[in-house]
């Protein structure tokens, strides 16, 4: 039996540097099955919204597992305090809301 496993990787960086038009989806529904369907539907990435969405960390981790198993690159929209945790869970990247200055952006980029 062969299984296609998508470990934590650097696909996001490569995708952003390519000339390819990327297809992504923004999801705030705390349901791993939706993430899995997006992967099998051919989306390149998904942004899991933990700012406005109602997913707890356990559900977020399961959504990240669903992303990996279906081949979609997961990005988590989260607050600054949650960056280390969601990266440890397997997010390929983070989107941090309310970044208002270049200095703040630089400081956040150094956390990753």
Located regions from the model:
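Expand to "…catalyze enediolate/carbanion chemistry for C-C bond making/breaking, isomerization
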Residues: 1-112
């Amino acid at each position: 039996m062969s299984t296609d496993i998508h470990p934590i990787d650097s696909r996001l960086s490569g995708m952003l540097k390519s000339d390819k038009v990327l297809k992504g989806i923004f999801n705030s529904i705390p349901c791993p099955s939706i993430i899995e369907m997006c992967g099998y539907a051919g989306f390149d990435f998904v942004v899991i919204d933990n700012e406005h969405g109602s997913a707890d960390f356990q559900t977020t981790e399961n959504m990240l597992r669903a992303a990996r198993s279906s081949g979609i690159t997961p990005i988590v929209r989260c607050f600054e305090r949650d960056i280390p945790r969601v990266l440890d869970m397997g997010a390929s990247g983070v989107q941090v809301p309310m970044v208002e200055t270049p200095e703040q952006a630089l400081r956040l980029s150094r956390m990753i």
